[in-house]
Design a protein with these regions (language model features):
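Ribonuclease/tRNase effector modules and their secretory precursors
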Residues: 1-103
Length: 103
């Protein structure tokens, strides 16, 4: 099973938690929990991998809500009992090529 498939399973079974930072970001940026779930469950892909991240391995996922809104979700690897959602934001097209590659 691929990394994104393992993450999708954790999300489907609601085995995830939001960090305080991710909660704050989602409120400020008007991103709902349902949108984050949609973005992971739908056509999503790991676009950056951070195996040596400061607080443990994590990755950046690009996904789209049911309404087509692109979201970036940084989360821990699925090896933890609960995936930690570290950051959530709508990528700025001025900073990203196709929301996948940093300019």
């Amino acid at each position: 099973m691929t990394l994104i498939d393992e993450i999708r399973v954790k999300f489907k079974t609601r085995n995830y938690e939001f960090s305080k930072h991710a909660v704050d970001q989602s409120i400020i940026r008007d991103i709902s929990v349902a949108e984050v779930e949609d973005a992971i469950a739908g056509r999503s892909e790991v676009i950056e991998d951070y195996p040596e991240d400061k607080y443990g391995p994590s990755c950046l996922i690009l996904g789209y809500t049911k309404g087509g809104r692109p979201l970036h979700v940084q989360c821990s690897y699925p090896s933890r009992p609960l995936i930690a959602i570290i950051a959530v934001y709508q990528p700025d097209p001025d900073l990203w090529i196709d929301f996948r590659i940093r300019k």
